[in-house]
A protein has these predicted regions:
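C-terminal/peripheral segments of proteins
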Residues: 1-96, 103, 107-110, 119, ...
Length: 257
């Protein structure tokens, strides 16, 4: 706009922001979702306790929905279970993208090709493990919804997305149900490996086709993250995962893949 009188002239103090301190649940799970649903219900901040003009997010991502479900399932959680949770690669049945997936599977089965694709989507377990046979089509469909929601636009036409996903899957996978790890790869040039995960899964992987490749290449997702624990005797132990930034593409670097 061009009106300076509508520009905010002050700041809310940190104490006015949504906060969670020492929740009884023992966990906080924040994954780009509304700040009013980050732990168990009794510990969540309440919208009526913070400034109404804060511009707080209202969305729930799959990572948020799935993570909260897993925390509820685990109750007490071990280090190994925390690792398992972080690398979970499934979509929640309660994820908002499932509504769009249902629109796609409800399309008319106009020919054998469409019928076969819809059958695979209906039987998909919503997982993105490397051996998964439904992920190539399923992730393609959900990625279209994810891109629309992230960009603030309406969902695309379901039929157009299904047709596009069928074409892409057959072109790079040679069949309707290739193993996800055969078409979803991580690496560079002729050096690459199968990779699990997908857009907005806790094991976050965002892939696209590069320069006419016969596969998808992971271009974003999991980067730097740490697991920190304290032993009974007070010792702190830390396990970190780091991709070394752009240096992994530098042939002179010891981190060059």
């Amino acid at each position: 706009g061009d009106r300076s009188d509508v520009i905010g002239q002050g700041y809310h103090p940190t104490s006015a922001l949504p906060q969670v301190t020492n929740p009884e649940s023992g966990f906080l799970h924040s994954a780009n979702q509304t700040p009013f649903n980050v732990t168990e219900a009794q510990d969540n901040p309440q919208p009526n306790t913070v400034p109404a003009d804060g511009g707080w997010q209202t969305r729930m991502t799959n990572r948020a929905t799935r993570g909260l479900e897993l925390f509820a399932d685990f109750e007490q959680i071990s280090f190994d279970e925390a690792w398992q949770l972080k690398h979970d690669n499934s979509y929640s049945v309660n994820y908002r993208g499932m509504t769009f997936l249902s629109e796609v599977t409800a399309l008319p089965r106009s020919d054998d090709t469409v019928s076969r694709a819809i059958e695979i989507l209906e039987n998909w377990d919503r997982g993105t493990d490397k051996d998964n046979r439904g992920a190539a089509l399923g992730v393609c469909v959900l990625a279209a919804e994810w891109q629309a929601e992230s960009g603030g636009t309406s969902n695309p036409d379901a039929q157009a997305i299904l047709d596009n996903c069928i074409d892409q899957t057959l072109e790079i996978g040679g069949r309707f149900d290739p193993r996800w790890g055969d078409v979803n790869r991580h690496g560079r040039d002729d050096t690459h490996w199968p990779v699990a995960g997908g857009p907005d899964t806790l094991r976050a992987i965002y892939s696209r086709r590069l320069d006419g490749d016969d596969h998808l290449t992971a271009v974003a997702g999991d980067g730097l993250y740490y697991f920190i624990r304290w032993t009974p005797d007070g010792e702190q132990k830390l396990l970190g995962t780091h991709q070394y930034g752009n240096d992994m593409t530098n042939p002179e670097s010891p981190h060059y893949l």
